[in-house]
Amino acid sequence: MRIELLNTPVDAVELRIEDQIRPRRMEDFTGQQRLTDNLKVFISAARMRGDALDHVLLSGPPGLGKTTLAHIIAEEMGGSLKATSGPMLDKAGNLAGILTSLQKGDVLFIDEIHRMPPAVEEYLYSAMEDFRIDIMLDSGPSARAVQLKVEPFTLVGATTRSGLLTAPLRARFGISNRFDYYPPELLETILMRSSTILGIGIERDAASEIAGRSRGTPRIANRLLRRARDFAQVDGMEIISRPTAMKTLDSLEIDEEGLDEMDKKIMDAVVNRFSGGPVGVGSLAVSVGEEQDTIEEVYEPYLIQAGYLSRTPRGRVATQRALLRFSDGSSALRGTLFDGQEHV
């Protein structure tokens, strides 16, 4: 039995459970303290003035709470949230329809905003700055521009690849924040809260074990908690004990550092198939049978954070730590392993 922690499609039941455990207020949001403290000030000031909150850009790896924070911003500002994603906005008309439907104080959340087509993105510029959009009616000699008013709103954009944002779009966000991975102690706090909402107890040692293998990511921690609940209930237990947590994690093949099957396939390919690198991400994607974007957005950030992988101008390179752990002892690596030089 195997799972891909971040790339597994989420069905309707999972989405409902995720929504159930999602914090609704800023004070219930755990972690990212500096970010949330600043947002509290910005939101309070905007409400005192009766203005829409400045547009907010949230960047960072998947599963750290960007979508949750967008919901909280809408709740704190007293507006409605309309959510979409960059790939869905493939036509300017789709974006225009959404923008003109917004009421004063509403929040428009665009996930994966870096994947929005450039032609559509340009329609956002005047909407963000002047709360208006210009659309073209007809074509050829009879074409004419029509200006439509947009109610003051807040755009919350989320991205896992902030470097792919165009400079004009990035410059229009008045508030920009980056999410960091969570330390285990904060993930424990999240797990204790989530277990209460899900109606099952969890021992502190069990929460600690799950937190330590959750890759610093609340979404993964909560998914593992739900799987541990499954094991506990099938075994007739009313509380998740440490042995139950260990049984769950072992069954899902998640090691002590939170690496899953795909992480290990990636590192095995870099270390053994490509002799430690450098290797291009396209070749790596073909080697492990995964999408290039998924490797770059989902797996690489944590492997780099964990000290196993480095990005260089020539490609991905295994660190000395990775060589020592993942090498199958091939002759091509022996000199690298013991020459005292680390790829950086």
Curated annotation (Swiss-Prot):
Residues the record lists as binding Mg(2+): T67
Keywords, in A-Z order: ATP-binding, Cytoplasm, DNA damage, DNA recombination, DNA repair, DNA-binding, Hydrolase, Nucleotide-binding
CDD domains, sorted: AAA
Keyword Cytoplasm found: yes
Pfam families: AAA_lid_4 (PF17864), RuvB_C (PF05491), RuvB_N (PF05496)
EC numbers: 3.6.4.-
Region annotation Large ATPase domain (RuvB-L): where it falls in the sequence: 1-182
Catalytic activity: ATP + H2O = ADP + phosphate + H(+)
Enzyme type, top EC level: hydrolase
Residues binding DNA: R311, R316
Binding site for ATP: I21, R22, G63, K66, T67, T68, E129, D130, F131, R172, Y182, R219
Domain notes: Has 3 domains, the large (RuvB-L) and small ATPase (RuvB-S) domains and the C-terminal head (RuvB-H) domain. The head domain binds DNA, while the ATPase domains jointly bind ATP, ADP or are empty depending on the state of the subunit in the translocation cycle. During a single DNA translocation step the structure of each domain remains the same, but their relative positions change.
HAMAP family, per database record: DNA_HJ_migration_RuvB
Family: Belongs to the RuvB family.
Function: The RuvA-RuvB-RuvC complex processes Holliday junction (HJ) DNA during genetic recombination and DNA repair, while the RuvA-RuvB complex plays an important role in the rescue of blocked DNA replication forks via replication fork reversal (RFR). RuvA specifically binds to HJ cruciform DNA, conferring on it an open structure. The RuvB hexamer acts as an ATP-dependent pump, pulling dsDNA into and through the RuvAB complex. RuvB forms 2 homohexamers on either side of HJ DNA bound by 1 or 2 RuvA tetramers; 4 subunits per hexamer contact DNA at a time.
Name listed for the protein in its UniProt record: Holliday junction branch migration complex subunit RuvB
Gene: ruvB
